[in-house]
C-alpha cells in the first residue's frame, strides 16, 4: 500500500480522534445499546436501532483511522527548505485580483481549506510543487483559470 504523507500535527489530530473514539465513544455506545436492550422487544426499539447504527459508524471510523495511521509517512516541515514541497506554507497573490492567500500543503486526511490546509492532491498544490519564490503558476480551478505569483515559502 502507498504511504500517506502527513504533518506531525495532522498525525497527532488523527491519533487523538482515534483515542477519543476507543476510550470514550465506543464504551458509551456499548452502554447505550445495553440500556436500550433492557427495554424489551428489539424489533420496534428505536433507541436500540439508533445506538446500533451509531456503533457501526464508530467502528467504521476506528477501522479507517487505524488504516490511515498505519500507512502514515510523517514529514516534519521544519526540517525542509527550498522549493515548494509537502509541508510548505506558501503565500500567493492572485495576479488578477491582488488578493493574498496563505496555504500549507498537507496530506488529504488533514486538509481543511477554511483553515488554510491545502490537500497535496489538489490542482493548486500540484501546480505549486517544485516552484520557488517569485515564480508564477497557472492553475485550472473549478472557478476557471487562475494565475498566482508565489510571494513566500516557509517551513514551520
Swiss-Prot record:
Keywords: Coiled coil, DNA-binding, Transcription, Transcription regulation. One of its GO terms (molecular function) is RNA polymerase binding. Pfam families: GreA_GreB, GreA_GreB_N. The keyword Transcription applies. Residues 46-66 form a coiled coil. InterPro entries: GreA/GreB_C_sf (IPR036953), TF_GreA/GreB_CS (IPR018151), Tscrpt_elong_fac_GreA (IPR006359), Tscrpt_elong_fac_GreA/B (IPR028624), Tscrpt_elong_fac_GreA/B_C (IPR001437), Tscrpt_elong_fac_GreA/B_fam (IPR023459), Tscrpt_elong_fac_GreA/B_N (IPR022691), Tscrpt_elong_fac_GreA/B_N_sf (IPR036805). It comes from the Bacteria. One of its GO terms (biological process) is DNA-templated transcription elongation. PANTHER family: TRANSCRIPTION ELONGATION FACTOR GREA. Belongs to the GreA/GreB family. Necessary for efficient RNA polymerase transcription elongation past template-encoded arresting sites. The arresting sites in DNA have the property of trapping a certain fraction of elongating RNA polymerases that pass through, resulting in locked ternary complexes. Cleavage of the nascent transcript by cleavage factors such as GreA or GreB allows the resumption of elongation from the new 3'terminus. GreA releases sequences of 2 to 3 nucleotides. This is Transcription elongation factor GreA. It comes from Ruegeria pomeroyi (strain ATCC 700808 / DSM 15171 / DSS-3). The lineage of its organism: Bacteria, Pseudomonadati, Pseudomonadota, Alphaproteobacteria, Rhodobacterales. The gene is greA.
Amino acid at each position: 500500500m502507498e504511504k500517506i504523507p502527513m504533518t506531525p500535527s495532522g498525525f497527532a489530530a488523527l491519533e487523538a480522534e482515534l483515542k477519543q473514539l476507543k476510550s470514550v465513544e465506543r464504551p458509551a455506545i456499548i452502554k447505550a445499546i445495553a440500556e436500550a436492550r433492557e427495554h424489551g422487544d428489539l424489533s420496534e426499539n428505536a433507541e436500540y436501532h439508533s445506538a446500533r447504527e451509531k456503533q457501526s459508524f464508530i467502528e467504521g471510523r476506528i477501522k479507517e483511522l487505524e488504516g490511515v495511521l498505519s500507512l502514515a509517512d510523517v514529514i516534519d516541515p521544519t526540517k525542509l527548505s527550498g522549493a515548494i514541497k509537502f509541508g510548505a506554507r506558501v503565500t500567493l497573490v492572485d495576479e488578477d485580483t491582488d488578493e493574498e492567500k496563505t496555504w500549507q500543503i498537507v496530506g488529504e486526511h488533514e486538509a481543511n481549506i477554511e483553515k488554510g490546509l491545502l490537500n497535496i492532491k489538489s490542482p493548486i498544490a500540484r501546480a505549486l510543487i517544485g516552484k520557488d519564490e517569485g515564480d508564477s503558476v497557472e492553475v485550472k480551478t473549478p472557478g476557471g483559470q487562475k494565475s498566482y505569483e508565489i510571494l513566500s515559502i516557509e517551513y514551520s
